Structure formats: structure tokens, C-alpha cells
Amino acid sequence: MHDRRLKRLESALQRNPADALSATGWASRAGMSPRTFSRLFQRDTGMPFRQWRQQLRLLAALRRLAAEQRVNQVALELGYESTSAFVAMFRRALGTTPGRYFTM
């Protein structure tokens, strides 16, 4: 990310991927309008904030699962409402469940 305000957001979400603050909330924290935030975010990352955050969480999940953390623990640590919501996101993103992903 090029914009220093977006770099701070990236650092904060790397430290706490479960943070559920909306794009509007992050825009407010950064002192931007939601529209400016969306434009800058799209320009710097090539994707909308929501998609980027999902990818960040997915990468964090892969690291934790590779370290043999339990699926339900990973789901809760990353801010998912339930294990099933996490598994559904994982399946949509990678085409398989977390358990099967690591046995392929």
C-alpha cells in the first residue's frame, strides 16, 4: 500500500485480523470520506476493502491451520461468527474444507 493511512490500517489488521470495523469506520479513523477511502483502497490494492480483508484472514487462517490449530479456534480468533461460517468462507475461497486442504 502506498498511502500512509492505508499502511496503518494494514498493520492494525495484520496484528488483529478479527477486527470487525467496517470500511466506513476505517475511513473515519483515517480522516477520509468513505468514498475517498474506497477509491484509495481499490487503487492501492486492486480490490475492495471487504475482499482484501477476507484474503488477509484467509492467509492468517492458513498459517494457523498449518501450525495445527483447531478449526474452531482459528474461526473464533479470526472473528468469524461460527466455525461453519469460517468453513463456508474457506470452501468458497479454496474449493475445499480446511480439513481436506491439508490432506491434499
Predicted regions and their residues:
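Terminal helix-turn-helix DNA-binding modules in bacterial transcription factors
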Residues: 20, 24, 43-83, 103-104
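Alpha-helical hinge/cap motifs
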Residues: 17, 42-48, 91, 95-96
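Short hydrophobic/aromatic patch on the recognition helix
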Residues: 37, 41, 85-86, 90
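…primarily DNA-binding HTH/wHTH and HhH modules…
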Residues: 66-67, 88-104
